[in-house]
């Protein structure tokens, strides 16, 4: 019996002895990955309540195996070797939201596109710009995601989170420390459970028309026919003012179409890396490192990733850090 199978069976047995809900073993992370990349998770669970999530986290604190909580996976690159612990997925049981006047309470697993359309239909303005962003509300809040130089944090009033030990607490907007594409939640051991937003009254017809325009523009501008994680690199305001957004910098460096294995810098939009079929995590990481080095050599700006890399052992950090460690000597400088 190989080590992975031993880990999987040992952890599953321990979990089943403690909990009475369903666990699955050796579940392919490729099937839940927006990039369609990833090996098997030793054990996989989709809890049905906040209490179950907290209980699982508390239990895993005393186990040697790693644990991670994921939502829509739009900003995650999974290790092609898999994950040697417990993956907790915020699925359909955490996808609800309630609109009460101008205030919205959304579970972390709620779909961003569905939420945006619902609030626009109700005539509430403020987050239509995020209508085409794939993924879930929890992930959007962690990254302070958005478009048009805006972020969801502008409208967040409070967030319910749990720490790595399963203890719940509420954070207000000031405590969340939102900055451009960042928050105190990023790179922390907290998991977002619920989010409260406060929007402003607007015109439903105008908001829905704006949403359709945004979606139409995205469909023309961004690759939708191949698996991808959305924007790979963060837009740096300083770089933006001189060079432009990451996609332009990558395109100007002549890197559109650069390929390794089945992974490619999209010909449609250079800030997207697409999977043509059987790309590996190494393929993606190699492209990330190559792009960073080439753009830096031409512009003097270092582009960081929006994407986080989840290793087999549970290391969870920005993909560019892993990429540069694995591929320190790439030299693609072109005339």
UniProtKB/Swiss-Prot annotation:
Catalytic activity: UDP-N-acetyl-alpha-D-muramate + NADP(+) = UDP-N-acetyl-3-O-(1-carboxyvinyl)-alpha-D-glucosamine + NADPH + H(+)
EC supergroup of this enzyme: oxidoreductase
Pathway it works in: Cell wall biogenesis; peptidoglycan biosynthesis
GO molecular function annotation: FAD binding; UDP-N-acetylmuramate dehydrogenase activity
Limits of the FAD-binding PCMH-type domain: 36-202
Record localization: Cytoplasm
Annotated Gene3D superfamilies: 3.30.465.10, UDP-N-acetylenolpyruvoylglucosamine reductase, C-terminal domain, Uridine Diphospho-n-acetylenolpyruvylglucosamine Reductase, domain 2
Keywords per UniProt: Cell cycle, Cell division, Cell shape, Cell wall biogenesis/degradation, Cytoplasm, FAD, Flavoprotein, NADP, Oxidoreductase, Peptidoglycan synthesis
Coiled coil: none
Ranges that cross the membrane: none
Similarity section: Belongs to the MurB family.
The protein, known as: UDP-N-acetylenolpyruvoylglucosamine reductase 1
């Amino acid at each position: 019996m190989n080590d992975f199978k031993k880990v999987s069976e040992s952890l599953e047995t321990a979990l089943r002895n403690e909990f009475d809900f369903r666990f699955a073993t050796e579940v392919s992370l490729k099937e839940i990955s927006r990039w369609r990349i990833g090996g098997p998770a030793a054990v996989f669970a989709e809890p049905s309540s906040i209490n179950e999530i907290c209980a699982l986290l508390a239990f895993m604190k005393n186990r040697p195996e790693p644990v991670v909580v994921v939502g829509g996976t739009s900003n995650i690159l999974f290790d092609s070797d898999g994950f040697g612990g417990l993956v907790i997925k915020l699925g359909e049981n955490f996808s609800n939201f309630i609109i009460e006047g101008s205030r919205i309470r959304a579970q972390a697993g709620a779909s961003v596109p569905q939420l945006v359309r619902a609030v626009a239909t109700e005539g509430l303005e403020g987050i239509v710009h995020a209508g085409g962003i794939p993924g879930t509300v929890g992930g959007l809040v962690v990254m302070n995601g958005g478009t048009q130089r805006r972020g969801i944090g502008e409208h967040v009033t409070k967030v319910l989170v749990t720490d790595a030990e399963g203890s719940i607490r509420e954070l207000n907007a000031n405590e969340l420390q939102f900055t451009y594409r960042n928050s105190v939640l990023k790179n922390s051991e907290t998991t977002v459970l619920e989010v409260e937003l406060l929007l402003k009254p607007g015109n439903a017809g105008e908001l829905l028309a704006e949403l359709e325009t945004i979606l139409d523009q995205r469909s023309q501008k961004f690759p939708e026919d191949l698996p991808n994680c959305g924007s790979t690199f963060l837009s740096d305001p300083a770089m933006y003012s001189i060079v432009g957004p990451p996609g332009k910098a990558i395109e100007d460096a002549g890197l559109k179409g650069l390929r390794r294995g089945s992974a490619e810098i999209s010909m449609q939009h250079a800030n997207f890396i697409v999977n043509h079929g059987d790309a590996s995590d190494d393929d993606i990481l190699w492209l990330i490192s190559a792009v960073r080095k080439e753009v830096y050599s031409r512009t003097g700006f270092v582009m960081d990733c929006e994407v986080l890399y989840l290793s087999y052992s549970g290391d969870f950090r920005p993909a560019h850090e892993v990429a540069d460690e694995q591929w320190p000597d790439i030299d693609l400088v072109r005339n």
